[in-house]
Every structure is written in C-alpha cells, then in structure tokens.
Design a protein with these regions (language model features):
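Intrinsic-disorder/low-complexity, polar/charged segments enriched in Ser/Thr/Lys/Arg/Asp/Glu/Gln
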Residues: 1-3, 30-34, 67-69
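Amphipathic, hydrophobic secondary-structure cores in small proteins
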Residues: 19-56
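An N-terminal amphipathic alpha-helical segment
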Residues: 1-27
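Generic structural detector for well-ordered beta-strands
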Residues: 7, 36, 71-73
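C-terminal structural segments of small proteins and small subunits
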Residues: 47-76
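Residue-level detector of intrinsically disordered/flexible regions characterized by low predicted structural confidence
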Residues: 6, 21-24, 45, 63, ...
Length: 76
C-alpha cells in the first residue's frame, strides 16, 4: 500500500474533487491518498464523490489550520 498527499488547499468547488478523481486514476487498488482541502463545500463533495465512485473515505478530520484532511482508499 502506498500513501500519497494531495494538497487542494486554496481551490474552490469542484476543483478538489476533480484533482482527487485525476489522482485516483494513477493509483493502484488499495493505495491511500490524503487530501487537504479548505473549501467548505469539500466537506460534502469529497464524501459524496467517494460514495458515488465506490472509493472508501477512511477518515475526515480538521487540521490545525482551517483545512480538512480526508483519507481516501482506492477500491476500484
């Protein structure tokens, strides 16, 4: 399993999800990506994207800054 970090801070909807989708294409099944995003819409968009595409949202937590950290495992 490989873990990668995708920094989407400063990007507004829908760019964090679009970056995540593009990044997932280059990952192997079982790999985990940590997405950092500070757009409030990402709190809804990233979990919804994972649910709709069959990926696993492992965790979603606020960081020390105003960003939120999302851990996503590629399943398909």
């Amino acid at each position: 399993m490989t873990e990668k970090i995708l920094d989407a801070t400063g990007l507004l909807c829908p760019l964090p999800v679009l970056k995540l989708r593009k990044h997932l294409k280059s990952m192997k099944i079982g790999d985990v990506v940590t997405v950092l995003a500070d757009d409030p819409a990402a709190k809804i968009d990233i979990p919804h994207f994972c649910n709709e595409t069959g990926q696993t949202l492992i965790s979603q937590k606020a960081t020390g800054s105003c960003a939120t950290e999302y851990q996503v495992r590629k399943e398909i």
